[in-house]
Regions:
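Residues embedded in well-ordered secondary-structure elements
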Residues: 5-7, 145, 194
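Conserved aromatic-histidine-acidic binding/catalytic patches
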Residues: 4, 109, 148-155
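Secretory-pathway-linked proteins and extracytosolic
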Residues: 1-138
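Hydrophobic/aromatic-rich core segments of domains that either
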Residues: 157-215
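Short secondary-structure boundary segments
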Residues: 58-73, 152-168
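Active-site-proximal cofactor/substrate-binding loop regions of enzyme domains
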Residues: 114-120, 125, 132, 146-151, ...
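Short, conserved helix/loop micro-motifs enriched in His/Cys and acidic residues
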Residues: 129-152, 184
Length: 215
């Protein structure tokens, strides 16, 4: 659960409840707010409820309202740790080990010198179509890089995964990392709190679309 309270008009009272089975551990936090949650066990469920009062209006022009402390954010998840949550994504970042990716890198870089490699690979990925679906809209599923190659399009996450795989197949550094949209205790940062995937690679340093935001 990642609930930024982004209301365009001031709110006198805002109520948010999260329910899980009573025996399931739940990590939760309210960021940029002081209201203490009410925790109850009801009919075999654990229910955590926040009642927020007098919330100021949210202004959409703010690029990082949660990080700046201007809006309350409610976080909740059942993962044992942030690392466990990220394993859901990490298990899908397999591009560098796919035969089709290695073959494509070899084909694209045939006859190219070392200084040309990263530009050739980036231009290829840039040339693919882009689906605007976010991670949450895809259910945090990332199609295999081979499927992205076959269909010639991908989400931003899928294209970053493919580029990382191509770079690694070419002997260059490229690692997919995440940026979170809010600062919170690690165990409260589930998948919903991810604001963007980005590529950590010295060979593309300064390329804006692959850099982290909201860190």
């Amino acid at each position: 659960v990642y609930v930024p309270v982004e209301e365009l008009s001031p709110v006198k009272e805002y109520i948010c409840s999260v329910s899980v089975p009573e025996d399931k551990p739940l990590n939760y936090a309210l960021i940029n707010g002081k209201a203490a949650p009410v925790v109850k066990n009801e009919n075999g469920s654990k229910v955590v409820t926040w009642i927020l009062k007098n919330i100021p209006a949210y202004y959409p022009m703010e690029s990082t309202p949660a990080l700046s402390g201007n809006i309350p954010v409610i976080l909740a998840n059942t993962y044992p740790s942030m690392a466990d949550a990220l394993k859901v994504l990490k298990s899908q970042f397999t591009a560098a080990h796919e035969k089709e990716v290695m073959a494509l890198a070899q084909k694209l870089l045939q006859g190219k010198n070392a200084d040309e490699k990263e530009a050739v690979l980036m231009n290829y990925v840039h040339g693919l179509g882009t689906s605007r679906l976010s991670l949450s809209e895809t259910g945090y599923r990332i199609r295999p890089a081979t499927e992205v190659i076959r269909t010639a399009y991908g989400t931003e996450a899928e294209k970053i995964n493919l580029l990382a795989g191509l770079l690694q197949a070419a002997g260059l550094q490229g690692e997919v990392k995440v940026a979170f949209g809010v600062k919170a205790p690690d165990n409260c940062l589930g998948l919903g709190a991810i604001s963007q995937l980005f590529l950590d690679s010295p060979v593309i340093a300064g390329i804006q679309e692959y850099q982290p935001v909201n860190t």
